[in-house]
Amino acid sequence: MNGLLLILLVYITVWRPRPCQCIQERDIQRDVEDLPSVSYQVQYGIRSQRDLMANVPIDQVPMIGVNIFDAFLKNGRNNDSRALLSFMELMQHGVQSFTVDLEPRNSQWMLKKSNISFTRFLNVFQTYVNGSDNNLSANMLVLLLKISPGNESNSTGTGKNGSNLTRILDQSFGRQRIYTPDDLDYDREYGRTFSTFGANSVGWPILGSFLYDKKRRVILMEVTNHLVYQNTPYIFNGSSILHLDEGNATLGIPTTVDQIQNLSSISWKFLEASFTTTDIKQYVDIGYNPVITNEYSVGDFGDIYQLLNLTILWSWKPDQPKTIQSSDSAREHQLIAYNCAALHYTSANFSASWDVENCYAIHKGLCKHRFNDYIWVISKGHDNYFGFDSHSESKCPEDYYFSLPKTPLEQLAITQYLRNTSSEDALFWIDMNSVSVNDCWVTGGPDATCPYQRSVSKRNFVAMLTPVTVCSFVILCVVFYLNVLHVPIHNNRKSWRRIITEVSKWEVDGVPS
């Protein structure tokens, strides 16, 4: 019996399936069915985009936005609860910025033309932030506040010039997740801010530091200049830090490297407009953050998905990154591993997007200049993905290195280079792969590890398992021996009892005299 129990114990500790070492995403309750469920492909794509932009200043991080009033509340076609549920669903689908119209009414701040208080809105906002506050799902969120001054009777109790907005934010959301003007001043004073050209005393922190070091999630900007900012220390004066176009874009389409660089020096480029599926992607490609003002009712809210599907992933194709499993028979005849990314250039419309490609396919690679993110060339020769490993002979020209575009403007620089060199449709290797762990897309070559899951090679796994297996076998042999061959003391139990009885007769009770 002891042997059977030990065998069971060894099986449980050694052979049982190992759980994933990554942090599991919290399930966020889905109460609406207007938009399709967020697929794993979209989740992997959003996560890979965020991770590759870890060193990008936050003012250059691309994001899609929605105007809450125009999309849900205008003309009163949606009830308040439905609008809040749609707001939650948009955040779950990757929308990162929202325009919020506020007006003072009944001694409190209310969302324009609705019965939704700003406090109630922030409670829904906080629910999403708390539910996504882990290294798999954390992202930056921006609220663009439009303040209606209101009349004196309506504004009584809301605080002069918005002074009680700070109290509302403290009570409903909390200071710890908000990046404030004081935080920015501190970072600039101590040299922790950057622009696209490097360290900059008037720049912004990089995304990785913002999310993981400072543990911030939210930036609030007021774009109507109705607040006294000494009374609202959590809110940025939007007119001094962002470029907001409404209706029509005022920034031209850059056609040279210098023009792209100049465009990248403009912080927080937003365009509020009614978009179509044909134009919204074009604005993303030239560095704008579209804020959708299209009007939707309960019956047609799902139409917004067409716009999101084209823009949430500025890098990958809408149906990528796919998980492609090759059959055993195919592996026997050729080397196959669909764990590498390639930039697919289409010459017909001078566009580019990323595809999952077989790592052993032969392509050229994209090389970035060491001192300028907007100067790119094609590698000298063709090779499989592993041929572009940093340990291999460099296939990039001097002062260039194998890389990938980290923003839409960098990708625009690539497409213009390919256009000027009359490149045909082609695939080019970029520094993105999931070689370590399937569906965990990382940069840094094939040796890069997945930060969310521990990868164990077969050789290392055998090395780890062998000592445990040998020890378990020895223990089993000992247990088997003890069960089969009895110890002599058990065979002579009666003799031992007689000896003990005789010895006990010589023991003296009490204290000797």
Swiss-Prot record:
Listed as disulfide-bonded, the cysteine pairs are none
Gene Ontology cellular-component terms listed: membrane
Signal sequence range? 1-22
Topology versus the membrane, per the UniProt entry?
Answer: Single-pass type I membrane protein
Q: Where in the cell is it found?
A: Membrane
This protein's major location comes to membrane
Q: What does this protein do?
A: May be involved in telomere capping.
Q: What is this protein called?
A: Maintenance of telomere capping protein 6
**Organism the protein comes from:** Zygosaccharomyces rouxii (strain ATCC 2623 / CBS 732 / NBRC 1130 / NCYC 568 / NRRL Y-229)
